[in-house]
């Protein structure tokens, strides 16, 4: 089997030639023997093009970098994937004004401000510019207020959406891609499709933001409180976001070249939501995107990294094929219980914590974690992966220990 065939066999709950291993990179510090020269510089930290609309990298990254990263992982037999994220635009009548304001008696940080002048009125977004020193490889705060950006949430002074009156304005910021953007995306997909076919690599298409977008737009506290105290406002906001997600997904499926549609859900776990609220606001929307993907002949994946079992019935009823990520350090039930719940219906990705086990575990602890994950979650319907990525601070010897342990146990029956 090639890597794509191995992934698809796992997603279909067939037995692959061995359990796949996948490692999402989010600034991963590659060891010297896996680096390469590109654009006159050594590529020390690895990323993914799926982040291009969400984060500001400290170093150059392109689809060509993605291709070389896949090759480097393949040299270690790791089942890397290619990832794409469709573009979008703002309404042509929207005007943007950016400025910064200095600290004052009530605010110790500089404030980065952006105002969108839309046909429905102005929409202002203000965050703190914290200027903290970050280590090599970590994403950085941009010099403007991006609409969708994880770093905005703890730094927010005025989030983009604070009341129902902002929703009409928001719609002008979530428009379809321009002809130029669409042409560029089609060219990108042509390159990705060609490389994926030549190398036998799976392609993931990240076209749906879901509740992550709501958290970026409103802040976490406002998002959760709105769901409980202003359900009509929250439902309309969800409808706006999912209409946007659906259009991006339809465009991505029309262009083609994607094996699995993925919806983000880092902010949709039981850290924030009860199963009842998830069922009320999210499950119907997830099911719509899953059904849309299935009609186009692709699989559908969802991301939730904590509280998997409490949300299991909602995930199952949403027709999800693949679930990222199962983190054993965050699950209150053992991995075998998780496997029993989803067996034969939803394939699982994860099994080892990147932030805990790979970051600070001993070689033996890593080995035991890998063996436990593969034995309890495999061999069918499972892709072993660090949850949820390899970050710049995870030591290479620990990644190497994970790979070695995986080779010991990947052929388990």
Feature-to-residue mapping (PLM):
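Active-site loop segments of alpha/beta catalytic cores
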Residues: 1-40, 145-413
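Short, solvent-exposed loop/edge-beta patches enriched in aromatic
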Residues: 15, 48-49, 108-110, 118-122, ...
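Segments that shape or occlude catalytic/ligand-binding pockets
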Residues: 32-99, 105
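Short hydrophobic-aromatic micro-motifs
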Residues: 20-22, 53-54, 116, 123-125, ...
């Amino acid at each position: 089997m090639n890597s794509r065939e191995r992934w698809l066999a796992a997603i279909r709950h067939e037995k692959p030639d061995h359990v796949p291993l996948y490692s999402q990179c989010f600034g991963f510090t590659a060891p010297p023997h896996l680096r390469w020269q590109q654009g006159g510089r050594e590529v020390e930290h690895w990323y993914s093009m799926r982040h291009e609309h969400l984060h500001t990298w400290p170093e150059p990254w392109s689809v060509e970098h993605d291709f070389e990263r896949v090759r480097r992982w393949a040299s270690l037999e790791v089942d890397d994937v290619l990832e794409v994220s469709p573009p979008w635009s703002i309404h042509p009548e929207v005007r943007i004004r950016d400025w910064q304001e200095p600290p004052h008696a009530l605010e110790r940080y500089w404030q980065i401000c952006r105002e969108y002048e839309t046909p429905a009125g102005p929409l202002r977004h203000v965050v703190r510019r914290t200027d903290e020193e970050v280590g090599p490889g970590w994403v950085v705060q941009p010099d403007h207020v991006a609409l969708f950006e994880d770093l905005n949430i703890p730094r927010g002074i005025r989030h983009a959406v604070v009341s129902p009156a902002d929703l009409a304005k928001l719609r002008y910021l979530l428009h379809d891609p321009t002809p130029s953007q669409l042409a560029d995306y089609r060219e990108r997909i042509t390159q990705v499709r060609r490389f994926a076919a030549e190398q036998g690599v799976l392609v993931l298409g990240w076209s749906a933001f879901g509740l992550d977008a709501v958290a970026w737009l409103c802040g976490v506290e406002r998002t959760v409180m709105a769901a409980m105290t202003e359900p009509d406002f929250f439902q309309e906001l969800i409808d706006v976001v999912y209409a946007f997600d659906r259009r991006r997904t339809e465009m991505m499926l029309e262009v083609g070249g994607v094996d699995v549609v993925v919806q983000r859900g880092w902010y949709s776990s039981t850290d924030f939501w009860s199963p009842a609220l998830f069922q009320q606001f999210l499950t119907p929307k997830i099911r719509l995107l899953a059904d849309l993907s299935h009609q186009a002949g692709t699989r559908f994946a969802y991301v939730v990294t904590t509280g998997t079992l409490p949300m299991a019935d909602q995930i199952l009823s949403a027709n999800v094929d693949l679930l990222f990520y199962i983190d054993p350090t965050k699950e209150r039930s053992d991995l075998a219980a998780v496997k029993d719940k989803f067996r034969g219906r939803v394939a699982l990705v994860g099994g080892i914590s990147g932030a805990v086990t790979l970051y600070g575990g001993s070689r033996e602890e890593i080995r035991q974690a890998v063996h436990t994950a593969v034995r309890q979650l495999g061999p069918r319907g499972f892709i072993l992966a660090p949850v949820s990525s390899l970050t710049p601070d995870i030591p290479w010897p620990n990644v190497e220990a994970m790979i070695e342990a995986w080779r010991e146990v990947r052929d388990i029956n």
